[in-house]
Amino acid sequence: MITRRSLATLAAGATLLPSIAQAQTWTPRRTETFTEGFPAPGRRPWADQVPQLRVGLLGGENEADRLGRFGAYRELLERTFGVPTRLFPASDYAGVLQAFSAKQIEIAALGASAYAGAWLDTNGGVEPLFVAEEADGSIHYLSVMVTRADSGITNMEQMRGKSLAWADANSASGYLIPRFSLRRAGIGVEPGQYFSRTGFGGGHEQAVVAVLQRQYDAAVTWTSGQGDEAQGFSRGNLTAMVQKGLLNMRDLRIIWRSEPILNGPMGTRTDLPAAFREDIKRFHLALPKAHPDIYKQIERGGGTGYREVRHQDFELFVELRREEAAARRRRS
């Protein structure tokens, strides 16, 4: 259980990653060592209980791009498991959380904070299946604060009195972790405390666009922090924007980076058959080697594949969500 003492330890400089490697009795499966091969096509016994597969897509980029990226993935799921498969793009992160609560979706790739929110909203009715690994095999990414390169802002001190866009209230990298980290550094995150104003950009892509269009002085978003910075790194929102022609990295400056954050999981409902959840795991563990183009599309870049996780790996984010909710109640 994450306690206030453990949060204090984190505030003293510990990483934002759980100690997955310390597990004594469980070895997570990884794509790199997964030898079972890609699942053979065919309708499964669990299909009587799961007659359709509904996949939630988090907000953060425009709907047409999301549907385009996941089109081949949807077709592969449908072909493999023999059940109609539909994509449900939400306008924001909250839409996916609400869909889980209403049992309107079976699976969704979530950020760590969004998973924690879904777990709280459903009273433990969702569980994580796996997370993406980065190019070096790690399972973390970074939150970064970006400004326009021509803004004259080169560090956090120069953000005093400037405006800041959060990405989404249910995003770890675009809200929860930067707020926690900035408060830890003695920087007030409420409007008028340090920044002249703060607001929500409407998603990661939209928040960066708002900076480029001078609607905000800075925004927070996510990146792997690995690979060629000129290309937006190896994976993340900046990578995707560069690939879509929406961003030239020369137009941005990164002025702040978080500590490593655990990658968000693929989440599913706990009331679904165990065989279904296992098949979804096996499908994804084998996907990067069997269908590398589809894997790179849905991950907005590449890595070494996927790794199994458990709920306990995300307990820190559950506690941070509770702390944030308590702080919000105190403000009101």
Regions found by a protein language model. Give the residues of each.
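Periplasmic-binding protein-like
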Residues: 58, 128-144, 201, 236-278, ...
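Acidic, polar ligand-binding/catalytic clefts
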Residues: 98-158
